[in-house]
């Protein structure tokens, strides 16, 4: 619905007939001040909240209203016989500043209810033009007609005092807040901005300045965002102010950059200027003669008061004539108020007043009310904004709102006076502007308004009482359309590739704000409409019908969407079934543009510019008829079956147009009396011969007579029992509103068209059709809601409320105070109401009587609204709420259409279910006291006026009333009458229930079944148990109705001494499971776990524990469940524990179910490698963790965390395997280094590798010693009589270590032989993945890396002689010459090949050419030596051999270049440390890399970890140079 405004109250200013000229509304204290022509000042304090609406009771809303109450009325005598020229409020201190034409300025304030005046200035020389406060009330500005300007602070300190003369009197003045230090003065021909020194900063002239009559009239401050500084749209700035000497503006805060100025001119132009630069940001023609302009708080709306340009203008004329009390020629009343929406400058309302001119206006704090000054009266107006609200099928309300300031600035501006601003039509765009523009200008019109898409609005999805509102903030939103189960949000998309092209993205959301499916349109629609099955979008030249059902089935995978299009489009000048529609659909030129659309599930209405409306059938899109309507419609909506079209026109009138398919007996007889008389003269066909007569209860003959059942009433019972063929109710399908085929054939002639129906209403701001009854429509007009019956063109008594109507639920109207919601989201729970129609209220009073009608909804009305209560939630009905239990039987039942009917002061349904779960709190053997009070009189008989109810529904046919009467008949056990009305209501399920009750012989059993149906379970159980003596039927009925709490309560009572065991364990577990699942859906997991613990389903119990965050119990469940019966459940619980990070609990549970592989994988995924290694070692599956453990170790070692890596490895207790894994890391690094190596090699390249190998050696040594200790302890336990000393223990450990080394040595020999047979080194690397190395081999590899680093460093510092020993030792030169002693370990071979070039370089540099030649021969024999390295060595050799005498022996050799064997005293070759005869090896110092002589052995230190020797040197070593272990 479009937004609107209407007059709420009119107050006479004075008794003497003085005209009011100015008004001001205090937005903090709610005071209204008004000033008149002769100096009268009147202060009013108003209250808009009625007592009935504050009570939060649904029954009170029938008479509630937003009537205005005057709490205070004070008249001040300040300006006697003087014209009031300005009125302004200081809202922070509640001070009122007034001035007059005699130069007097007063400031009045109140203290304890008494108003005190203070004279501020008395200037007899000139009249005051303006006395105004700054927006933050920190400053005050006084402007006089002679140009005198007085500017000061609110406390009285002067800021500026001077005279500014422009040759004429100023029109108005404004003072800015603290954000920017400027003030504004406006003359007729210019608006000037001054700083606080009185220097002019900029000036602007009014648009169309060549017209001498155009001048500035009034202005106010505006607000905008930081991005609003745009390029000037016209050269209206004074060029004299430009230049380097231009005065500057002092800005105190960032918000000062975005301040704007709004001004109106005498020719009706509304202009927006930047305060900082004076640039024109936007302009629009108001088409009135403005006098005053005011911006609402929050800057959402703008109000302009004045008069129409001509007395015959139609603006607001319909609303003016509709107001009561307006007499005489309405053309003399030219006062008008125009309200704009600042987001897009769309017109909200044109409010015509019965006065000559509206001189002033002011907003209240909410921005929803206006006080107007016009003639001799003060008018209070209410603005009813549109929230684009819709009611979804599940009761969710969707509506739009904005929570921050809208901007009145836009990149697209309406400077052209020939174009009007966009109207609030459909979603956003202007229908009238599109109509007035020629077809060739349609595209340019779109370009101007596309950038006005709303980007600051939020779409809220709110299900009252059941959930918090969901929010969606779409970017560049165009429209929001309700489609019953979905909400379609249209957003604007722009394609900037090539030419600028716009398209529309449509996304459909569910009630929980979840996007479900979407579609794109290649154009931007102006008009939209939606139903449950279709979404219709249209521009002026194009129309599209989207099949929602097909999209929904595609989204959930029910259909194959390949080559299927769910959008049907055609051009406006074509028709849906045209053969060339696909070729012409994108054509922009159009002869008869589209100006509106409306649709339902079966019909589509398309309005054209020539005042015709085309009606198509859906889904066939066949043209059914063409209708003629009034021009300039703003809003269109159709009823549920597409037989009535409601149009709200631009003049404010509402018209209902009847289609040719619509039929009403009353309207047809009224408009076609002759044809109706002819039909009456035709004899009616005789009914078939009766086979059985319908007999009502013998005790109530009046009811039978009222129903019209006599001797001629018969029923056929062969095919279907009790199918009534004739009755007093006419054979018309009142639920559809369309004429049946037999009735249409009986009429003579064609179908007549019923004239349009136009109710005399003004200020219409809401219209909702019933989704079930096509004749029922609710209209919001001013402050009341009126229900119309279109079949009789009658209206019900109005319901006075200012709530927005959202939808229908049967005969109830769903309404919400969205105005309050838009200002405070926390008040959502108090803004939802259900209003009853007059028919529902009258039938309720007839059935129960006026004295017995309960305050809230009674059981019968609720039962009807819930469609027989066959789908109620039995858990909520059987729970025992302590404090929030509804007062009626069905208050806790959630109907189908709406989610809940909350009553203020009561608890929502979601909270009522949690009743403490005390199943023994209530006694089910006693009948309900509520039922006794509501249904039974004092003598125990049911007190229901059934005859009066039947008589009432005869004159008010409605399916909803039929259902209520059927429920009343069922409660009184008049089953024949109940069956009849259930048939009339179309409720065949309840009809079959009544027929099944008729087959029962016992009246008590019928009563018990009836009580079960209506929800009075305690009374039904009382009848079953006490009267019939059949407690088993109670259990059966409770099971069928899923009354699980009652079953649990009965089971607990039956297990007491003397109880009957009617409920077995299986049924009890099912009850606990159902209740637990219910609480899981309600997200009350703690309560759910208590029930699911006894459900026999441990997996559901585990899920509830997980959701309830009861993790200790979840872990205990995984340990306590039997493995044989619940293995799968234990595995699922282990996954839950893993999600919580409890690796120990998850792995323990998986090991219990014999799934160690999963336990290892989970431990690896959660980075618990110690647990993974322990489990893998225990179950002999270590091969599955090698890769993961290697990666993790690599990360630790790369980060330098050696201690962390060592601790992790020792926790695994698999030292030998882990050492092999570490060496594998070294192999990969060595392979990379060897391939990418350079010559000479940097010294620090092997530091990381050496550290890794040392770590492996430490781990292997540690594991070996731990195993030796275990063996020693085992040996000691075998010989308990022997005492082990420390010396014996160390000796035994050394013996075990030596034995282990010998066994590993034999293993290495075997591996060496195997390596000889290998074809390549790569194959040997692959086999090394699982090879275990002995501790000496690991430390040998570590020593190789140490010697490579040491020799490389010696070469780096220029000492080749010191590099020869460590390099040759690392290269295993003498081991390679003797093949029997060479090692097949791939790491040793890699390191040897890397060390050979270093040794050769050292020998060449030192001058030992013989040794260098031997080394080069070994290098040349290496086929894998890189060519670049080979060339470097050859060049170095040639260079050195050419410079030196190669036959000479080096003269600089030291004494230790050649040593004797320490065993056989054989002289060894130079730089050789191994004897070939006895295999004696020279000890090498790991600190210097040099051999240790026998006489120096006493000055060495032995490392207990790596067993390496190091000379002490000049300083004592504290740690081992190889493994960095402290010396002991």
From Swiss-Prot:
WD repeats lie at residues 123-170, 244-285, 619-667, 759-798. Keywords: Cell projection, Cilium, Cilium biogenesis/degradation, Cytoplasm, Cytoskeleton, Flagellum, Repeat, WD repeat. Residues 914-933 are annotated as: Disordered. GO terms for biological process: intraciliary anterograde transport; intraciliary retrograde transport; intraciliary transport; intraciliary transport involved in cilium assembly. It is found in: Cell projection, Cilium, Flagellum; Cytoplasm, Cytoskeleton, Flagellum axoneme; Cytoplasm, Cytoskeleton, Flagellum basal body. This is Intraflagellar transport protein 121. SUPFAM superfamilies: Putative isomerase YbhE (SSF101908), Quinoprotein alcohol dehydrogenase-like (SSF50998). The lineage of its organism: Eukaryota, Metamonada, Diplomonadida, Hexamitidae, Giardiinae. PANTHER family: ANAPHASE-PROMOTING COMPLEX SUBUNIT 4-LIKE WD40 DOMAIN-CONTAINING PROTEIN, IFT140/172-RELATED. Component of the intraflagellar transport complex A (IFT-A) involved in flagellar assembly.
């Amino acid at each position: 619905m479009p937004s609107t405004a209407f007059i709420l109250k009119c107050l006479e200013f004075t008794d003497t007939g003085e005209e009011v000229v100015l008004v001001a509304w205090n937005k903090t204290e709610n005071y209204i001040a008004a000033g008149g022509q002769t100096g009268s000042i009147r202060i009013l304090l108003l209250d808009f909240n009625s007592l009935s609406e504050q009570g939060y009771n649904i029954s009170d809303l029938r008479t509630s209203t937003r009537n205005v109450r005057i709490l205070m009325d004070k008249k001040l005598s300040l300006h006697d016989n003087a014209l009031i020229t300005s009125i302004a409020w200081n809202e922070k201190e509640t001070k009122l500043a007034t001035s007059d034409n005699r130069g007097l300025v007063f400031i009045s304030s109140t203290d304890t209810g008494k108003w005190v005046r203070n004279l501020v200035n008395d200037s007899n020389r000139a009249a005051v033009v303006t006395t105004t406060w700054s927006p933050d009330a920190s400053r005050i500005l006084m402007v006089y007609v002679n140009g005198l300007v007085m500017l000061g602070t609110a406390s009285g300190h002067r800021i500026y005092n001077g005279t500014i003369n422009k040759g004429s009197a100023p029109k108005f003045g404004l003072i800015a807040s603290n954000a920017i230090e400027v003030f504004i003065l406006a003359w007729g021909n210019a608006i000037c901005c001054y700083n606080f020194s009185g220097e002019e900063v900029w000036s602007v002239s009014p648009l169309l300045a060549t017209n001498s009559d155009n001048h500035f009239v009034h202005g106010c401050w505006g607000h905008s965002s930081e991005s609003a500084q745009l390029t000037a749209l016209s050269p209206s700035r004074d060029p004299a102010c430009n230049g380097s000497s231009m005065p500057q503006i002092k800005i105190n805060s960032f918000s000062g950059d975005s301040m704007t100025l709004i001004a109106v001119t005498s020719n009706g132009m509304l202009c927006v200027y930047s305060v900082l630069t004076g640039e024109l940001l936007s302009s629009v023609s108001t088409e009135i003669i403005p006098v005053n302009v005011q911006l609402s708080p929050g800057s959402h709306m703008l109000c302009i008061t004045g008069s129409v340009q001509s007395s015959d203008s139609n603006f607001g004329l319909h609303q003016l004539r509709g107001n009561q009390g307006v007499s005489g020629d309405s053309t003399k009343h030219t006062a008008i108020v125009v309200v704009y929406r600042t987001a897009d400058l769309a017109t909200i309302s044109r409010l015509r007043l019965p006065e000559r001119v509206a001189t002033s206006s002011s907003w209240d704090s909410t921005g929803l009310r206006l006080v107007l000054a016009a003639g001799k009266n003060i008018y209070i107006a209410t603005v009813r904004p549109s929230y684009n609200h819709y009611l979804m099928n599940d009761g969710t309300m969707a509506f739009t709102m904005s929570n921050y300031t809208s901007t009145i600035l836009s990149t697209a501006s309406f400077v052209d006076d020939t174009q009007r601003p966009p109207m609030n039509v459909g979603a956003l765009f202007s229908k009238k502007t599109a109509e007035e523009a020629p077809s060739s200008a349609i595209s340019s019109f779109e370009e101007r308004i596309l950038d006005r898409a709303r980007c600051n609005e939020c779409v809220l999805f709110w299900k009252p009482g059941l959930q918090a509102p969901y929010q969606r903030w779409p970017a560049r939103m165009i429209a929001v359309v309700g489609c019953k189960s979905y909400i379609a949000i249209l957003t604007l998309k722009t394609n900037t590739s090539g030419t600028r092209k716009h398209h529309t993205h449509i996304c459909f959301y569910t009630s929980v704000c979840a996007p479900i499916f979407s579609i794109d349109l290649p154009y931007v629609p102006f008009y939209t409409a939606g139903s449950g099955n279709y979404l219709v979008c249209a521009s002026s030249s194009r129309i599209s019908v989207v099949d929602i059902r097909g999209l929904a089935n595609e989204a959930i995978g029910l259909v194959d969407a390949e080559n299927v299009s769910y959008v049907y489009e055609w051009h406006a000048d074509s028709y849906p079934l045209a053969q060339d529609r696909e070729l012409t659909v994108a054509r922009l030129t159009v002869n008869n543009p589209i100006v509106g659309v409306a649709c339902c599930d079966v019909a589509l209405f398309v309005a054209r510019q020539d005042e015709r409306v085309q009606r198509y059938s859906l889904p066939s899109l066949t043209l059914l008829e063409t209708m003629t309507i009034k021009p300039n419609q703003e809003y269109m909506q159709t009823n549920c079956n597409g037989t009535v079209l409601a149009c709200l026109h631009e003049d404010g009138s509402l018209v209902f147009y009847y289609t040719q398919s619509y039929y009403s007996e009353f309207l047809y007889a009224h408009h076609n009396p002759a044809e109706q008389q002819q039909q009456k003269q035709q004899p009616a066909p005789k009914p078939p011969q009766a086979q059985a007569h319908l007999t009502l209860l013998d005790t109530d003959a009046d009811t039978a007579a009222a129903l019209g059942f006599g001797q001629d009433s018969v029923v056929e019972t062969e095919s279907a029992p009790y199918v009534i063929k004739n009755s007093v109710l006419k054979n018309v399908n009142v639920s559809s509103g369309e004429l049946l085929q037999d009735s249409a054939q009986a009429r003579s002639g064609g179908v007549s068209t019923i004239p349009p129906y136009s109710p005399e209403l003004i200020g219409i701001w809401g219209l909702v059709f019933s989704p079930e009854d096509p004749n029922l429509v609710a209209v919001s007009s001013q402050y009341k809601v009126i229900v119309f019956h279109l079949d009789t063109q009658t209206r019900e008594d109005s319901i006075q409320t200012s709530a927005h109507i959202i939808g229908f639920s049967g005969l109830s109207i769903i309404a919400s105070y969205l105005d309050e919601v838009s200002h405070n989201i926390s008040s959502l729970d108090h803004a939802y109401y259900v209003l009853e129609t007059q028919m529902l209220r009258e039938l309720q009073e007839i059935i129960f009587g006026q004295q017995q009608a309960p305050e809230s909804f009674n059981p019968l009305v609720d039962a009807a609204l819930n469609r027989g209560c066959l789908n109620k939630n039995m858990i909520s009905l059987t729970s025992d709420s302590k404090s929030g239990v509804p007062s009626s039987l069905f208050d806790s039942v959630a109907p189908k259409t709406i989610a809940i009917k909350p009553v203020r002061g009561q608890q929502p349904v979601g909270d009522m279910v949690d009743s403490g779960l005390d199943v023994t709190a209530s006694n089910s053997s006693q009948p309900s006291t509520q039922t006794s009070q509501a249904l039974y009189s004092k003598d125990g008989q049911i007190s229901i006026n059934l005859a009066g109810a039947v008589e009432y529904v005869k004159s008010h046919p409605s399916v909803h009333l039929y259902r209520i009467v059927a429920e009343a008949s069922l409660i009184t056990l008049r089953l024949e009458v109940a069956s009849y009305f259930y048939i009339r209501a179309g409720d065949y399920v309840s009809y079959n229930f009544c027929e099944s009750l008729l087959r029962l012989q016992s009246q008590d059993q019928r009563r018990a079944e009836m009580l079960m149906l209506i929800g009075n379970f305690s009374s039904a159980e009382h009848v079953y148990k006490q009267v019939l003596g059949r407690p088993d039927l109670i259990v059966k009925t409770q099971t069928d109705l899923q009354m699980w709490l009652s079953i649990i309560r009965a089971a607990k009572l039956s297990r007491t001494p003397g109880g009957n065991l009617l409920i077995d364990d299986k049924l009890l577990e099912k009850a606990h499971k159902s209740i637990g699942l219910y609480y899981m859906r309600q997200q009350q997991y703690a309560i759910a776990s208590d029930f699911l613990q006894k459900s026999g389903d441990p997996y559901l119990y585990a899920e509830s524990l997980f959701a309830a965050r009861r993790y200790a119990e979840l872990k205990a469940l995984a340990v306590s469940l039997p493995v044989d019966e619940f293995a799968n459940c234990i595995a699922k619980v282990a996954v839950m524990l893993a999600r919580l990070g409890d690796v120990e609990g998850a792995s323990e549970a998986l090991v219990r179910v014999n799934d160690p592989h999963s336990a290892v994988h989970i431990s690896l995924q959660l980075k618990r490698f110690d647990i993974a290694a322990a489990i893998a070692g225990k179950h002999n599956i270590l091969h599955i963790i090698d890769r993961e453990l290697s990666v993790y170790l690599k990360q630790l070692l790369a980060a330098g965390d050696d201690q962390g890596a060592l601790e992790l490895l020792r926790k695994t207790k698999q030292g030998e395997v882990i050492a092999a894994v570490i060496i594998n890391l070294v192999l990969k690094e060595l392979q990379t280094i060897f391939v990418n190596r350079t010559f000479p090699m940097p010294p620090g390249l092997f530091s990381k590798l050496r550290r890794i190998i040392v770590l492996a050696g430490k781990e292997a040594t540690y594991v070996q010693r731990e195993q030796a200790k275990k063996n020693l302890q085992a040996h000691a336990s075998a010989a308990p009589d022997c005492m082990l000393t420390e010396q014996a223990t160390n000796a035994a450990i050394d013996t075990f270590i030596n034995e282990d080394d010998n066994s590993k040595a034999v293993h290495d020999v075997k591996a060496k032989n195997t390596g000889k047979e290998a074809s390549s080194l790569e194959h040997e690397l692959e086999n090394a993945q699982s090879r275990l190395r002995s501790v000496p081999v690991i430390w040998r590899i570590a020593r190789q890396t140490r010697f490579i680093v040491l020799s490389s460093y010696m070469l780096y510092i220029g000492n080749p002689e010191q590099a020869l020993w460590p390099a040759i030792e690392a290269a295993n030169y003498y081991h390679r010459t003797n093949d029997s002693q060479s090692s097949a370990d791939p790491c040793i071979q890699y390191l040897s090949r890397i060390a050979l070039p270093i040794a050769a370089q050292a020998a060449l540099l030192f001058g030992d050419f013989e040794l260098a030649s031997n080394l080069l021969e070994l290098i040349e024999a290496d086929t894998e030596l890189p060519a670049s390295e080979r060339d470097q060595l050859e060049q170095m050799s040639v260079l050195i051999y050419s410079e030196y005498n190669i036959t000479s022996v080096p003269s600089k050799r030291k004494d230790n270049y050649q040593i004797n064997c320490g065993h056989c005293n054989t002289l060894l070759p130079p730089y050789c440390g191994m004897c070939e005869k006895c295999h004696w090896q020279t000890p090498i110092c790991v600190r210097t890399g040099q051999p240790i002589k026998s006489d120096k052995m006493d000055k060495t230190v032995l490392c207990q970890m790596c067993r390496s020797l190091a000379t002490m040197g000049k300083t004592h070593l504290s740690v081992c140079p190889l493994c960095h272990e402290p010396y002991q």
